[in-house]
């Protein structure tokens, strides 16, 4: 009885959703064109990451080398997107990472992916709402923060924010109501905000390079000493000066934080299907966002010494630093519009994902309720908006930004892993008889005097199948070999990332760290070759990731390595969230 219950439970965990059960819009009507989806992705990316994270990372973590941070984070995002495009091509009727996971990998895998993407959107909404209030408060002389610190202090340092930001809560609820009124109306507002953002951003980049000074990339401790004699407000740490004032370890940590800036493509992949190929939309928005981040971070650090950058309002205060006072207000308006469009870009796809998961029974069924002829998921919008608003009310931006990076990196790593495994799996229509035949082939035949040689024959057949597959197309046996090797590779890459993240100086200084890394690389190469030797599926796809299995494994390694830069507190919060989901 117990065995049967356990077996049924296990079958539910690996149960796959039939592709024929997917509706064209997966339960909700789509009113967004391809251009609107590009606006959604660009507007979501060019938000808090551009106007808040850039200043904080440049001032405290990387200095002018923040451009390298965005290069590393952008590379990781590019590899993840390429893997997602193939993942999406396997389920042509849906563009949601959650639905694709449900169809191809099973219920448990889909829930983990979907639950972490929901966390990503919740935190992104809370962070952006806080960032909007920071920018607005800075524009009016910090009047709001000073008033809230006096009236609603929280008195829980290291856990909660200094004060409860009731204005951030109100902003999230207001936008939730706007979304509940209908997607076309909110999309129109979204285009206006994003257009203003792009215009102001272009002005900021051009002005920054005009007023920039290359000396700010070659600062010394003497420059810092002279600055402290003139300015009385809080300065950032000077480091060693130069283009990379802090160690390489800090640059990598900055790259992990900067990944926050590239999580917006989940907004596109969760929203819906359009005529334009998903690959074009996703990669075009990534290119635009990377160029914007690279240009803004370069212009900012050229205009202002990195240790003088304002933490919460870096771009408007940069114009004040160079004597362009009126331009500060123009840029501030653009910042507010950008953050507003980013908020809408987070809340819209979050409600769609919640509604879809509720329809599948993985969340409360009430959240799947839609209203009106437009089928707007009002319950999902208002419940997620309320939860995100509470997070914005209680937590500081810096406390939860890294948590969002962990959630997105894990979700994208799972997509890359899925692409690696699925490429080597047999057709889903493989008969049970063929599977049983392959299992029988793996079992050695027992015949009297040959009993003693049975283990050797079995091991020999298994080893031979690792290097010399018996079929030119994937079989059940070759698929199982790839799955096992892929899990082993993830374990080895995790150990390697941990060593490189925790003891980088010991690794490059000699033994025993260097020896350990060399052995790990040898094992990783060997297992990777085993996967490479297995037959790939000939099924036609609109896009196939090149250089398999190398590219997905590099993507997984970069994502894991960036995750290893996070603090123990971030991992504790992440664990609590996943325990709640279970």
Language-model features, listed with the residues they occupy:
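Alpha-helical transmembrane bundle of multi-pass secondary transport proteins
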Residues: 1-582
